[in-house]
Amino acid sequence: MEEINLYLDDAKDSMQKAIKHTELELSKIRAGKASPNMFDGIMVDYYGSSTPLAQVATVSVPEPRSITIKAYEKSMVTTIEKAIRDANMGFNPQNDGDVIRINVPPLTEERRRDLVKQTKAEGESGKVRIRKIRQETNDELKKLLKDGASEDEVKRAEEVVQALTNDTSAKLEALIAAKEKELMTV
């Protein structure tokens, strides 16, 4: 039935988006080495409006444990420095007037454990999104029974949704395990 395929495609797309979202969130968790992605969530006050750091400066990694941030406008350097300090990322930015330099300290064992907890929480959030998508799709499929779809078709579609859920959950588990390994590798 055409409608069933639409619901299955929609569920697949939504689950892929949930994976992508979790990947993005996990990329923001720093693993001891410098990465421009670490600053994706930082918002800077740009003439009264909250603007992502990437839109007001370039973030580069000249060495594995250092980051340089060059503002597009010189007047923004102190504002960017303040935004980084306010983000409580554990960095001590040095402002030399033109460029902000940040040395990325190695992670302590305690900080690594905290980041693993954060990773697990993000992973659990992704799993909840996937289960919610499964539930919504199954609810829509059950409504089709009232609209004249056969029980066999709906049952098969529910099995496909469950297989899709299992597959997506396995991908999510692999992402989480890889991030945990990355965090705990000294």
Swiss-Prot record:
| A molecular-function term among this protein's GO annotations | ribosomal large subunit binding
Gene3D superfamilies cross-referenced by the UniProt entry: 3.30.1360.40, Ribosome-recycling factor (1.10.132.20)
Instruction: List GO terms (cellular component aspect).
Output: cytoplasm
The cellular location(s) given in this protein's UniProt record come to: Cytoplasm
Q: Which SUPFAM superfamilies match?
A: Ribosome recycling factor, RRF
The protein's matches in Pfam families, at most eight in alphabetical order, are given as:
RRF
Origin superkingdom: Bacteria
GO terms for biological process, alphabetical? translational termination
Keywords noted in UniProt: Cytoplasm, Protein biosynthesis
CDD domains, alphabetized: RRF (cd00520)
Question: What PANTHER family does the annotation carry?
Answer: MITOCHONDRIAL RIBOSOME RECYCLING FACTOR PSEUDO 1, RIBOSOME RECYCLING FACTOR
What family classification does the UniProt entry report for this protein?
A: Belongs to the RRF family.
Q: What does this protein do?
A: Responsible for the release of ribosomes from messenger RNA at the termination of protein biosynthesis. May increase the efficiency of translation by recycling ribosomes from one round of translation to another.
Q: What is this protein called?
A: Ribosome-recycling factor
Tell me which species this is from: Cytophaga hutchinsonii (strain ATCC 33406 / DSM 1761 / CIP 103989 / NBRC 15051 / NCIMB 9469 / D465)
